[in-house]
Curated annotation (Swiss-Prot):
GO terms for biological process: symbiont-mediated evasion of DNA end degradation by host; symbiont-mediated suppression of host innate immune response. The keyword Lyase does not apply. The keyword Oxidoreductase does not apply. GO terms for cellular component: virion component. Signal peptide: none annotated. It comes from Enterobacteria phage T4. Keywords: DNA end degradation evasion by virus, Host-virus interaction, Inhibition of host innate immune response by virus, Viral immunoevasion, Virion. The gene is 2. It is found in: Virion. It comes from the Viruses. Binds to the viral DNA ends and protects the viral DNA against recBCD mediated degradation. This is Terminal DNA protecting protein.
């Protein structure tokens, strides 16, 4: 199952993943104009009333027409009872909810450093909402520092995993999908597809989790690279459970630190086969 084909073929059109503040503003203005227009106000009157140059207003309405149309559709869907929505409408609401949590920019001044430390990791992870836990829950996302048991023989490994936790397996091993083993954009697409199919809530809330196991995700592109087993005793420090409303942000952060034979290993090389 090719996840990227699924997204292109079945996902309704939604606003761009990373809107600028200017775009968000214009989309809101566009929604207000549609209401005013329904009451008989012209575009020129609307623009003048708000102190906007008419040519600027018409240009923006044209440029963001698709985003305005989608936002209008979302508003209508949000007013409908959930049991009256079809599958496609529910998926649109979920993906819109997920993408609305994206921040305009995640500051990460340490992203380019070559040797990321546990201190760097601890400081960087504070940029997203999360809390320390002892017992992880399947279907949630966790970040932690890790010291691989077989680091001398592994071709490469990740010091700071970011996993969708699947549960405990044989020998008390923690199984999870380490999102760092695929590129940031692919992480977002992968997570969106899981949310559409397996989320336990219709929109992103603090209670959101993914009702999945390995059998449900093993066919997704990149899953065989992401699936990892972790020894609880080799986790350095605490597990940080990422709040669902920050999933969209944390998957785009360059937290990964791949290591091979004690030296930093290029993430691009890890992703080259995806």
């Amino acid at each position: 199952m090719a996840i990227f084909q699924i997204i292109n073929e079945s996902t309704p059109q939604v606003p761009k993943v990373k809107q600028s503040l200017n775009e968000k503003k214009w989309i809101q203005i566009g929604l207000e104009y549609k209401k005013a227009k329904a009451k008989g106000m012209t575009g020129k009157q609307f623009a003048e009333e708000r102190g906007i140059k008419y040519s600027t207003f018409t240009s923006a309405m044209s440029k963001y027409a698709s985003g305005i149309k989608t936002a209008e559709k979302i508003q209508k869907l949000e007013s409908k009872p959930m049991n009256k929505l079809n599958k496609q409408e529910r998926q649109l609401l979920m993906i819109n909810s997920f993408r609305q949590t994206l921040r305009d920019k995640i500051r990460n001044e340490g992203a380019a450093i070559n040797n990321k430390t546990r201190k760097w990791f601890a400081e960087t992870i504070k940029q997203v909402k999360g809390h320390k836990v002892v017992r992880p829950q399947p279907g949630r996302i966790y970040a932690f520092a890790y010291d691989a048991k077989h680091k001398e023989t592994l071709p490469y490994w990740d010091k700071f995993p970011l996993i969708i936790y699947l549960g405990l397996g044989k020998h008390n091993l923690m199984y999870g999908l380490n999102l760092h083993y695929i590129p940031p954009k692919a992480r977002q697409q992968f997570l969106e597809e899981l949310l559409k199919q397996y989320a336990n809530t219709p929109t992103i809330t603090n209670k959101t989790k993914l009702k999945i196991d390995w059998s449900q995700v093993k066919g997704f592109r990149g899953a065989d690279q992401m699936i990892k087993a972790y020894i609880p005793g080799n986790i350095m420090g605490s597990l940080v459970e990422i709040a669902p409303k920050d999933w969209a942000n944390v998957v785009l952060m360059p937290l990964q630190q791949f290591v091979s034979k004690g030296k930093r290993f290029s993430a691009n090389k890890v992703w080259s086969n995806i």
